[in-house]
Amino acid sequence: MPKITAYIIAFNEAAKIEAAVNSVLWADEVLVADSNSTDNTVELAQALGARVVQVPFHGFGDLRNRTLEHCTHEWIFSLDSDERCTAEARDEILALVSGEPSHDAYLVPRRSYMMGRWIEGSGWYPNYRQPQLFRKTAMRYTLDPVHEGYELLTSKPVGHLTQAIHQFPFRNMAEVIHKMNRYSTLGAAKLTRKRASMASAFGHGLWAFIKHYIFKRGFKDGWAGFVIAFGNFEGTFYRYAKRYEETQNWQPPPSEKLTRPKP
């Protein structure tokens, strides 16, 4: 049977890394690509038997490509630290690679949870990202700093698994805000060839809210759906606002050296 490397990218994920690693202990190799975490992510992963390599962060696309260089086996299963493989997905993967797969890369459905519930709307299911199961020689990632795409190196089309993995993107509201701030900064770098203004920031942000809350039926997910839509408004607004800020060279008023007046 062909062997599988499960890789997980991580940065300061001590609160999540154990659950992620535990969910892929069935793989022949578990590799954690750490980007110089300052918490005990590395120690926790190693204690569970994962092999840890240090890969500096220069955008998610570059990070994933460099991680692939450290993967040992023919088949790759990609997992983020906020994701968990399920028993059903494990069984489907093992059965697939032990047979004669029709494809060299497979998209994996993700069942995402927020505020204690499964998010069925909001564009969060099946919520495919790049293929998460693929032959090592079949795919590379594009070099986008965030929301990276992929390039197939095979003539076969992408397949789809039927069994979902689980995703828990946010532990609390603080993580929602933190991730929005980080991703909007990374996303601003993708707008270098676009003109931005505060008006365009608001317009793009408003459309992001409407798209997720109305057209992607986020309203069906209760307050969680509203938070997701509002978070997309904020992330999109600040992505364009940060790009606009880069073009303005705003400066504070000139400082003065103030001493006590002479009598």
Regions found by a protein language model. Name each.
Residues W26, A47-G49, R129, T154:
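Short, structured coil segments at secondary-structure junctions
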Residues Y7-E29:
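Short, well-formed alpha-helical segments that are part of the catalytic scaffolds
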Residues S23, D34-L44, D80:
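A conserved acidic beta->alpha catalytic loop
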Residues V42-H70:
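Conserved donor nucleotide-binding strand/loop of the catalytic core
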